[in-house]
Regions:
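Catalytic strand-loop segment that frames the active site of acyl-thioester-processing enzymes
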Residues: 20-57
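HotDog/MaoC-like acyl-thioester-processing domains
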Residues: 71-74, 103-107, 113-158
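Short aromatic-glycine motifs in intrinsically disordered, low-complexity regions
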Residues: 9-19
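Compact, glycine-rich, soluble single-domain proteins
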Residues: 53-72, 86-87
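Small-residue-enriched segments and motifs
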Residues: 23-26, 90, 110-112, 139
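Single-stranded RNA-binding regions, centering on S1/OB-family and related RNA-binding modules
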Residues: 1-11
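Hydrophobic beta-strand-centered segment that forms part of the acyl-chain substrate-binding groove
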Residues: 5, 71-109
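Conserved positions in beta-strands of structured domains
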Residues: 26-29, 98, 113-115
């Protein structure tokens, strides 16, 4: 049986639909109802690492937020004994990047908190990326998770 108090021992890939090399978050740290804290550890092997910046460009932070939201959905799916579903990043509001890059050798925590969710799968999350307890990026992120991804994609293609 899944124990959310032992998230830090779990493989991130068990909770999100992404696969390497596109898994950007390193660890799930803490779950509470409607909220998840994750960690991203930066190395030269990190996706989007730019040696000219000696880090990852700040705009990748929106994907750290989106993958943390996906991981929250994955934790909730595990708690329901449900499958991991694909979701879609629709956009963001109030996006503020307080740093120009995520630096090599540093760890960043991403906290996502659900503000609103409709039965249709549309949701809004408050997201913050922290470094040493300081907010370095923040946004309200809009996402959509259809109940049947294949049917949704087929309908959208018509």
């Amino acid at each position: 049986m899944f124990d959310p108090t032992k998230l830090s021992e779990c493989d991130v890939a068990e909770f999100i639909p992404h696969r390497d090399p596109m898994i950007l978050i390193s660890q799930l740290l803490e779950y509470s109802q409607d909220s998840l804290l994750t960690q991203t550890d930066l190395s030269t092997a990190s996706p989007y690492f730019d040696p000219r910046l000696n880090g990852v460009p700040n705009y990748v932070g929106i994907e750290y937020m989106a993958q943390s939201i996906a991981a929250l959905a994955g934790v909730e799916a595990h708690l329901r004994n449900d499958i991991i579903r694909v979701g879609f990043l629709l956009g963001s509001r109030k996006l503020k990047m307080h740093i120009s890059q995520f630096k090599l050798g540093q760890s960043y925590q991403t906290k996502v908190t659900r503000l609103y969710q409709e039965e249709s799968g549309l949701a809004v999350f408050d997201c913050q990326i922290l470094h040493n307890q300081e907010v370095v990026a923040e946004a309200n992120v809009n996402v959509f998770q259809p109940q049947d991804t294949q049917a949704y994609i087929a309908d959208a293609a018509q």
